[in-house]
Amino acid sequence: MKRLKNKDYKEVISFDDVILVPQYSDIISRKEIDTSIYINELNTNLDIPIISSPMSTVTESYMSNTMSSLGGLGIIHRYNTIEFQRKLVSFITNTNTKSAAVGVTGDFKERLSALVEVGLNSVCVDVAHGDHILVEKAIEYIRSTYPDLFLIAGNVATGSAYNRLSNWGAHAVRTSVGSGSICTTRIQTGHGIPTLSAIIDCYNIKKERLDEGKYAPYIIADGGIKNSGDIVKSLSAGADLVMLGSMLSGTKETPGNIETD
């Protein structure tokens, strides 16, 4: 086990540590503001840089279709049978944004094949620790077997991990480990970096890759986003998109039963 040394410590910041300073503006109307992002690999434009999380309590076909109608993206969660997930993907009406999550072990190859058969064009390799050899092998398999799929992978917490996933072939990287509302990775394992610091670290590597003429995946801020201000801070820090879970949970578009007391 690696031992901690003084040089291993560094200051990190979370959303609550930062406030943006108001600046002079020549924007007459908020309607003039353009937050859209063009996803080259999907040949589609997202009017809003927001993705609904592939959580069992957040995204199934209803949420995915709603996100698409609002200009965002929804990723169908993987915590169901292959046949049921396949059915959910088939219910997505926008053929440009059929997205779902898979794991990296077990039935993931069989699952992915079944999803591609019903028009999947975006896959999220969904694991707690994205900087891992199994993720590397999964990305290698997906890129070689389904080269036209838009590939999201993660989660990672450092610029070096972002760089590795870039080299492995990810098109987008989910950034932050263990800071979501129900994610306990940071607490249970003692590992993680606050989302804002993770974004900044990854963005610095992204700039370096672009300066060197290399492909640089989209950065997806994922975890600990509690309000619209956190979304703004994420984008200001260098994220291209944000992934929301708790902010969307409990809405009528989410799966689950309504309980009344």
Predicted stretch roles:
Residues 2-7, 12, 18, 59-260:
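Alpha/beta enzyme core
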Residues 1-50:
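An N-cap/entry alpha-helix motif that binds or orients negatively charged groups
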Residues 32-39, 43, 47-78:
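N-terminal cofactor/phosphate-binding cores enriched in small/glycine residues
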